[in-house]
Amino acid sequence: MNVSSMIERLVHDIYCLTPKKLVLCCFLAVVAYCFLCRKYAGRRWLRPCLGGLLALWLSAVLWITVFSRSTGNTEAHWLPLSTYWRILSGESRELLRSAFMNAVLFFPAGLLLGGLLPGHRSFRWQLVCAVICFGLISLGIELTQFFNRLGNAEFDDVLHNTLGAAAGLAAFHVKWSD
């Protein structure tokens, strides 16, 4: 079994989790992350480790969304919130799961970014940084998928990914509040 098939299997297994199990796994990961950040706060090696984890996360996301896909048909849905209109019109409820999974995919990025950004900056400043940074990354992924015919390109994916990153950043700040 090569690395590519192992990654595909892992992604498939994660995607097939029920939403309750996925939320539970995310919650446990956040608790573990918060515990480690609090325990090792102020250590010199913590930020480089978080930066490395963020780079690893970005590599995994690019692998999942761009490099592991083969070319084929592509559709573009650039109308904001079109996913919800399509669900209400009777299309597959799988679209709702896909929206949720897009948010979950970017949640770790916001969590990691919270540990990397300077602590003396306000939450609002950090939130703007996260929205711009991960919004542009997500837009880049969607445009790459569209122009290389690697799947559907949707504005809603950019929205859900960005909301997931913002939720991760908010989770980081909730843990540090007194």
Enumerate the predicted regions with their spans:
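Bulky hydrophobic segments
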Residues: 1-150, 155, 166-178
